[in-house]
Amino acid sequence: VTMNKPGQFIQDKDGDWAYIKENGQLATGLQIINHQKYYFDPTGKQAKGKRLLLDGKYYFFDNDTGAMFVNKFHETGDYFSKKYTYFGEDGSQIFGWATIEGKRVYFKEDGYQVRNDRHKIGGFDYFFKKDGSMLANDIDGNYKYYYADKDGHLQFGWVNHDNETYYISPPWGAEDRTYLQNINGKTYLLGPKGRLLRNTATD
């Protein structure tokens, strides 16, 4: 590492970055520089594009700047298989339930957010929409459609919603098409998302 002035970032011949503190020493560990948090390993090398376990919590450092993610999603994977993790107010990775921008969301044990999928949590089934928000008081789905009550718990069987009657087939949900459904020995005509199209049933 070439010698530079204190209080600035320097780059070595391998392209790695370090920071010279005001006392002239290389920064190591977590550092606050210009109101941003950064991490430097014991040799002074700056962490970039890395998820690190520090004091029992996970943190992520930006690929370009090295700044710690705070209140920010980290996106991985390609267009068809994107995965999302989230780092909160203190920069640590969020697991389990959280409220982000007013939306109730959930992160699995591996830290990835449940999106556009059904997931069982604490004995209850939930559905999380494409943006990751929990379905509540509404009908939505991906290949199958579900109704969730105000607490997000999925309900099956006959459901009344917005002055319409729906049948949500247990356990897999309603279809997104017009179809005949046998229910307790009677056949009903159902529309997309399980909406009852006529009140007459045929034996």
Please place each PLM-identified region on the residue numbering.
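Extracellular adhesion/carbohydrate-binding repeat motifs centered on closely spaced tryptophans
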Residues: 1-203
